[in-house]
Design a protein with these regions (language model features):
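Right-hand nucleic-acid polymerase module
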Residues: 1-122, 132-270
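Cys/His-coordinated zinc-finger cores
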Residues: 126-128
């Protein structure tokens, strides 16, 4: 394990056809730990929101493809649930009925769902991402309590970040989201002390000059760079870099395929 006073850590998630990562300093001062500045509630709220969006985006990229479905469910007048508990129970029963339909086809249902209050009318509705295999007419008909609109899950070069932002938002939702237990949970690979300050300076300069794609695509040859950003922390003077990449043979697929990278040993590996 790296034992220096300060080192740079590279944390990488490979989720289907997409990759995202962060490069940031880790401080290991001996003796008494330095006091940390507690973020304001507003800053912490924004950080929590950003982390929730990243978590959900990775989850979708790891489990769903363009063959899967985005579903919007509403209630007709007179069918609206009166409480949060009733809304969750209705959605759970709907998911249970879908599972039986999938099982008859020899398929396993995967899903991510959330329940929302309408911004203007306050009416409850649901958003669901679910695995394909059952025809969309049946999926909509099984709902039976109002309007159901299904469409193919759409990916762009950044994946489903826009959809993840919408679902992961905190306001108007009962809770951020629910998910089935059979989802693949994204794993983080960490590389400690393998990038020195000269490397960080090279990345900063490349981002400033607009040539950052060369550095990242050389490091991860199976992927194309979508975006890379960096900022300086005014308190600890460290440089923080975030990057997003897409597989070169991009298909919108979440099929698990190993990523080809420059040979490195993750931290903690024997």
């Amino acid at each position: 394990m790296y034992t220096g006073r300060t080192f740079n850590r590279e944390s990488v998630y490979v989720c289907g056809d997409y990759m995202d990562g962060d490069i940031y300093p880790v401080f290991q001062a001996p003796g008494k730990r330095r006091s940390r500045c507690k973020p304001t509630s507003e800053i912490q709220q924004k950080l929590n929101q950003k982390n929730a969006e990243k978590k959900l985006t990775r989850l979708v990229h790891s489990n769903f493809t363009e063959d899967d479905i985005a579903l919007h469910l509403t209630y007709r007048p007179g069918e609206e649930p009166q409480t949060e508990e009733e809304a969750q129970r209705i959605l759970s029963n709907y998911i249970r009925r879908l599972k039986r339909r999938y099982a008859k086809l020899g398929l396993e249902l995967k899903y991510i769902s959330c329940t929302e209050y309408g911004k203007t009318n306050g009416k409850v509705h649901h958003h669901v991402i679910l695995s394909g295999g059952l025809d969309r007419d049946t999926i909509e008909k099984v709902w039976g309590l109002g309007y159901a609109n299904s469409k193919r899950l759409q990916f762009n070069e950044s994946g489903v970040t826009g959809l993840a932002h919408y679902i992961a938002k905190d306001k108007h939702f009962f809770k951020r989201w629910n998910q089935s237990r059979n989802l693949t949970i994204p794993q983080c690979a960490q590389f400690d002390g393998q990038l020195n300050m000269d490397d960080i300076a090279d990345i900063e300069e490349a981002i400033e000059c607009g040539t950052q794609w060369q550095w990242f695509e050389d490091r991860y040859p199976d992927f194309q760079l979508v975006e890379a950003t960096c900022y300086k922390n005014n308190i600890n003077r460290g440089t923080y870099i975030h990057f997003e990449m897409r597989r070169r043979e991009w298909s919108g697929s979440s099929a698990a395929r190993p990523a080809r990278m420059k040979k490195r040993t993750p931290s903690g590996a024997s």
